[in-house]
């Protein structure tokens, strides 16, 4: 049975197919993206040489913060003020990882342009309406958006070297795991999260040379779908703040924190986290070692370069996030967060 499929969901189309990148120009045209601006990176373009030729314009997205990057590119791709009544904004196609896709979503939220995403990592950004907005344009936006079209090529999404792939896979697993205990958790998001966890764990247990990359990629899509539906919780609050204030890398920070966060939550929310343990082939009291195993025994935050001098500031910032008020159990304290993070240091 082929793992390829087309998923139509409330106006969004997801095409999951081996070779989707090679067929991207035709698939884009088939779904109304005839003339488009392509946002990408040199690395991603090297894996899709024909796509740049099909684009009306190509814009490289450098490293940086999403609001600043989106603001800079907005000036380039936006229809001038006087033309807005006479012309529709040119669609945007994002070929790359989470940064590229989030920049496209941010611009689309301002201009009204349709957005298509062709992910080259397991960031999950292609499945969510979670993104920052262009700096200086926040008052021009009614809300955030998700791509209308996703072209998911499993080989492209899982092409990283083994250590990086494991960190990205745990990050993808975390998307679903964090959605299991929020106020918006529902049967659909729960099913997607648990299916994602099972698929990712099964693939990571395999020999790297024989790994089910389609399973990893599907797990990434489903986990991000669950997060988009039910929202985020403790794990993402901790990771996002550590990355922003303490300077640790994104995927690796998730790989270090998730085992400790889920072990912490297994005590507070056994009815939510117990099924997660079962999905990855373990028991609730063995979640931490199992997730560490799946992550390839990831490095601690200290080894990742996190700035311990800013940890108190980071914890105070975490406690201000509204999502923590909904974490099951007694109200979280500074000591709770400090202990969780210290275990991952």
What kind of region is each of these model predictions?
Residues 21-24, 44-48, 99-106, 124-128, ...:
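Short glycine/serine/threonine-rich phosphate/pyrophosphate-binding segments
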Residues 6-8, 30-31, 84-87, 108, ...:
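Solvent-exposed alpha-helices and their adjacent loops that cap or buttress functional pockets
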Residues 1-91:
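ATP/NTP phosphate-donor binding region
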Residues 81-122, 238:
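A short, small-residue-rich loop immediately preceding and capping a beta-strand
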Residues 7, 37, 280-345:
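C-terminal charged capping/lid subdomain of soluble metabolic enzymes
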Residues 106-188, 195-196, 272-275:
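A glycine/threonine-rich phosphate-anchoring loop and its flanking beta-alpha core
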Residues 182-289:
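Active-site segments that bind and position negatively charged phosphate/pyrophosphate groups
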């Amino acid at each position: 049975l082929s793992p390829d499929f087309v998923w139509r969901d409330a106006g969004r189309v997801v095409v999951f197919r081996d070779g989707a990148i090679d067929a991207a120009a035709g698939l884009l045209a088939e779904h109304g993206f005839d003339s488009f601006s392509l946002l990408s990176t040199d690395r991603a373009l090297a894996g899709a040489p024909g796509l740049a030729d099909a684009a009306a314009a190509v814009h490289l997205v450098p490293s940086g913060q999403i609001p600043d990057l989106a603001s800079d590119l907005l000036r380039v791709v936006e229809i001038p003020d006087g033309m807005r009544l006479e012309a529709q904004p040119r669609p945007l196609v994002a070929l790359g990882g989470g940064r590229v896709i989030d920049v496209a979503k941010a611009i689309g939220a301002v201009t009204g342009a349709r957005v298509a995403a062709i992910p080259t990592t397991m960031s999950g950004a292609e499945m969510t309406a979670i993104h920052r907005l262009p700096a200086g344009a926040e008052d021009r936006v009614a809300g955030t958006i998700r791509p209308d079209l996703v072209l998911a090529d499993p080989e492209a999404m899982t092409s990283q070297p083994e250590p990086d792939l494991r960190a990205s896979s745990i990050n993808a697993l975390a998307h679903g795991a964090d959605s299991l205990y929020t106020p918006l958790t529902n049967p659909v998001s729960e099913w997607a999260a648990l299916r994602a966890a099972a698929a990712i764990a099964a693939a990571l247990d395999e020999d790297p040379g024989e790994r089910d990359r389609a399973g990893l990629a599907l797990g990434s899509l489903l986990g991000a779908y669950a997060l988009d539906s039910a929202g985020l919780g403790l794990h993402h609050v901790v990771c996002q703040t550590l990355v922003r204030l303490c300077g640790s890398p994104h995927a690796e920070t998730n790989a270090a924190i998730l085992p400790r966060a889920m072990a912490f939550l297994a005590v507070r929310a056994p009815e939510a986290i117990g099924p997660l343990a079962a999905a990855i082939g373990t028991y609730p009291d063995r979640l931490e070692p199992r997730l560490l195993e799946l992550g390839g025994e990831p490095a601690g935050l200290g080894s990742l370069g996190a700035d311990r001098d800013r940890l108190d500031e980071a914890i105070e910032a975490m406690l201000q996030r509204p999502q923590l008020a909904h974490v099951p159990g007694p109200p979280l304290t500074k000591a709770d967060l400090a202990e969780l993070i210290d275990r991952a240091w």
